[in-house]
């Protein structure tokens, strides 16, 4: 459960991401594909090379979903319901992959926002991404 301090930390940190959200989303995906090659199996139709338009496009989708979650932090299940349905029923993404992407997002944010990435912000973002992952996997059951 996100505390009021966690929610503030997440909103402040995501606000600093600003116009780079899509770029950071794509970078996190690239990190995931390189670090966890089995995740590539969900994207057989993508050009997964560095800087590809498809990875950038999906990175923007990831970032947009996170922006939506930040904006609806008190009602993520409702806000992310369609995305949860998509990943559970159509795409059938293994839930462990959300944890892998979350880790890569944290690494990416730490690399780009070192001054802002304090231990408290790190913990809050980790809890937030775990909450997003829980919502996205809630319809698997």
From Swiss-Prot:
Pfam families: Globin. The modification N6-acetyllysine is found at residue 16. The modification Phosphothreonine is found at residues 8, 108, 134, 137. The modification N6-succinyllysine is found at residues 7, 11, 16, 40. The keyword Iron applies. Keywords: Acetylation, Heme, Iron, Metal-binding, Oxygen transport, Phosphoprotein, Transport. The keyword Repressor does not apply. One of its GO terms (molecular function) is iron ion binding. Heme b binds at residue 87. GO terms for cellular component: blood microparticle; haptoglobin-hemoglobin complex; hemoglobin complex. Residues 1-141 form the Globin domain. InterPro entries: Globin (IPR000971), Globin-like_sf (IPR009050), Globin/Proto (IPR012292), Hemoglobin_a-typ (IPR002338), Hemoglobin_oxygen_transport (IPR050056), Hemoglobin_pi (IPR002339). Transmembrane segments: none annotated. Involved in oxygen transport from the lung to the various peripheral tissues. Belongs to the globin family. This is Hemoglobin subunit alpha-1/2. It comes from Macaca sinica (Toque macaque).
